[in-house]
Amino acid sequence: MKKSAKIIYCCQRCGYQAPKWMGKCPDCGTWDSIVEERTTAASLRDVHRPQSSPQAPPVAIDSIELEKENRLLTDIQELDRALGGGLVPGTLILIGGDPGIGKSTLMLQALFGLANQGVRVLYVSGEESPQQIRLRSERLGTVSPGLLVVSEVDMDSILATIQSETPQVLVIDSIQTMYNAELASAPGSVSQVRESAVRLMLMAKKTGIPTFLVGHVTKDGAIAGPKLLEHMVDTVLYFEGDRNHMFRILRAVKNRFGSTNEIGVFEMKDQGLDEVANPSAVFLSERPANAPGSAVTASLEGTRPILVELQALASSTSFGTPRRTILGLDPNRVALLAAVMEKQLGMHLMGYDIFMNVAGGVKVVEPAVDMAIVSAIASSFLDKPIAPATVVLGEVGLTGEVRAIGQIDSRVAEVKKMGFTRCLVPDGNIKRIRNLDGIKVTGIKTVSEAAEMLF
């Protein structure tokens, strides 16, 4: 007897399920995101059931034998860095980013690097035909006989291809285009994305094939589909950057086999993505000399210190309420620091519009750049350039104190490497710096004390 389809209403944003339609999702609060989906209990059981899964008895954790971790290197050092040192066998990696940011380009270049090492790789595209992939590969210079390509969206066909071709690395581009015939909903729906990811996860763990899942993002920048998708995978990478800027940042926000918040920096060119081995030099290459409103600081991305230039412009406001336009920084943090400057430094910023930008389109969110924000605003407000070859570090509290920051040694080492000769750091960090040769490091306790040393 044929089972009738069960109708459920599912939120396309968070995966919340309800027996009837609602205009607003009660779980995530999104309007008009709940759509009708049809499925059967039998089909769901079929999708979740592994092909052959004999029951495994529990074992004591100390009796489990560890094999030597053999990571595959993609020949793209910035990607390997973001992954924590290469590809772990059986890992499931989700990479998301805005349309046109370079996700598919990065995947093709990574597979080309692996194919050149003799690794058998498979690129599954649900968005392009093999001819279109070949055209793009010709432009990128990534044509290789070891790079297998197939255009397919049906999960049964894809798993059959994987079983017959036995690739050592797999890319699915994209997970939102995959389709399970057992489910009546359209490709890209929450249930389709969830079930496709489950089947690929079971395959990856069983066969040991490292698998990349390329994911679309929503207009708020989150990966489209259920949040369960990010919980299910081993690594989540976000490809960030403005399409109007040439730099791209690959950021690891989750990594079971490496450091989180690790980044890789790339530059988009006509022939694809180029690695940026020394981001500090690139971000500071066009910095104007002796310009008011410019401050340099060392931001820590994962374990990697990068020197960035913060730019500020304070100008008299033409409106009753001054404007605060911030790019690349936390606007709330800048507003907080502006209030501290009014109270502690006596600068009447309420009559000034404040515009701030991080040069190169980088995003900086850590509190360790607070003193650089204060310095850039003060420099523009007073129309005085900061002393040459000076870098400013430190977190600022509401009472104007400058607090110690982490990884001070690696930050100061990067400052020295880039040729800066003077560094203002929190007084609490002075004793932790082991090597002071070739650079003058000055401890500061308050923002008012720092203001006297900046110019």
Predicted feature locations:
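Conserved Walker A/P-loop ATP-binding site and its immediately adjacent core
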Residues: 126-132
